[in-house]
Regions:
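Conserved N-terminal beta1-alpha1 strand-loop-helix module at the mouth
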Residues: 1-69, 79-88, 93-103, 136-139, ...
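Conserved residues at the C-terminal ends of beta-strands
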Residues: 30, 73, 108, 165
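Charged helix-capping and loop-helix junction motifs
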Residues: 40-45, 120-128
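Non-cysteine beta-strand/loop elements that form the S-adenosyl-L-methionine
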Residues: 103-111
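A short acidic, helix-capping loop that chelates divalent metal ions and anchors anionic groups
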Residues: 111-117
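Active-site-adjacent loop and "lid" segments of alpha/beta metabolic enzymes
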Residues: 117-120, 141
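Short, glycine/charged-rich "phosphate-handling" switch motifs in NTP-dependent
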Residues: 160
Length: 202
């Protein structure tokens, strides 16, 4: 999940907490308009939420704000900083070919994005799959992903995961939205566990 406090229906820390409870395990902290001190404080608030669920907070930009994970834009910096986890935004085969020591890439936009109107043209799953086959690192699909069906199509195209912004940030219930989007990743065992939990609640 990527953050955008301007689209969130409530406080960002609350949204992230609910999303993590719903199954999100990676959060990319954007909020690049904040002063560094405020952004670092926000990162410090979010890290324990992710850590408690075995998740990871990734900071957008080369400065990990005291952490060990960063997500870089397509244009730089090169070489990537030496951190525990480094990802990069990519949009075409040329950008994927420039990857060196990155651990993963996002490829976008897969679908038209309400968060970035006019951003595109959208790749759609077929072209996404072609780029994934060219990528030297695992790929997360990004852009306009709002339904479980879209998630499933990205996974079937070869994505190891999806990066979602608006579908969770704008949701009345971020936890419920996150859980719905996670359904395509569930195994038969996790479906059984969830059903058993629901039965006990009933």
């Amino acid at each position: 999940m990527l953050t955008d406090r301007w689209q969130a229906r409530r406080g960002l820390v609350d949204v992230v907490g609910a999303a993590v409870a719903g199954g999100v395990r990676w959060v990319v902290l954007r909020e690049k308009d904040l002063p560094r001190a405020e952004r670092a404080a926000l990162a410090a608030d979010l890290r324990p939420i992710l850590a408690g669920a075995g998740g990871t907070l990734v900071v957008a930009g080369p400065d990990p704000l005291g952490g060990d994970a960063a997500h870089l834009p397509a244009a730089g910096p090169y070489p990537p900083p030496r951190l525990g986890l480094v990802g990069r935004s990519c949009h075409d085969a040329a950008e994927l070919a420039r990857l060196t020591t990155e651990d993963y890439a996002t490829v976008s936009p897969v679908y038209p994005s309400r968060s970035k109107p006019g951003y595109g043209p959208p790749l759609r799953p077929a072209r996404l799959g072609g780029l994934i086959r060219l990528s030297p690192v695992p790929v997360l699909a990004l852009g306009g992903i709002e339904t479980p069906g879209q998630v499933r199509a990205c996974v079937e195209a070869g994505a190891v995961g999806v990066a979602v912004l608006g579908a969770i940030m704008r949701a009345d219930d971020p936890g419920e939205a996150a859980a719905a989007l996670a359904i395509p990743f569930e195994t038969p065992q996790t479906r059984h566990d969830h059903a058993a939990t629901a039965g006990r609640r009933g």
